[in-house]
Amino acid sequence: MATYAIVKTGGKQYKVAVGDVVKIEKLDFEPGAKVSLPVTLVVDGATVTTNAKALAKVAVTGKVLEHTKGPKIRIHKFKNKTGYHKRQGHRQQLTVLKVTGIK
């Protein structure tokens, strides 16, 4: 079995392994910068580590590839009988991260 980790960033959790490219919530780093993310769980073959003291020594390192935007989400507010319509769109800002190591 391969080694993987669950990292928490931007209020979400992601399953990552070395070499994975993941889109996460925007981080304030320039493209090419190295990033370290906090780990919630590590699976190394048959052993699963969830102990907080052991996980304090573990970090997932990655490299920021680029900043991009997610798909457009359209919001439409409507109130009956008043003629009130409001259309709005939103694109979430994302960071593309390549995982370089789990240490």
Swiss-Prot record:
Keywords: Ribonucleoprotein, Ribosomal protein, RNA-binding, rRNA-binding. The keyword Magnesium does not apply. Pfam families: Ribosomal_L21p. Transmembrane segments: none annotated. InterPro entries: bL21-like, bL21-like_sf, Ribosomal_bL21, Ribosomal_bL21_CS. One of its GO terms (biological process) is translation. One of its GO terms (cellular component) is ribosome. The keyword Ribosomal protein applies. One of its GO terms (molecular function) is structural constituent of ribosome. This protein binds to 23S rRNA in the presence of protein L20. PANTHER family: 50S RIBOSOMAL PROTEIN L21 (PTHR21349), LARGE RIBOSOMAL SUBUNIT PROTEIN BL21M (PTHR21349:SF0). Belongs to the bacterial ribosomal protein bL21 family. Part of the 50S ribosomal subunit. Contacts protein L20. HAMAP family: Ribosomal_bL21 (MF_01363). This is Large ribosomal subunit protein bL21. It comes from Mycobacterium leprae (strain TN).
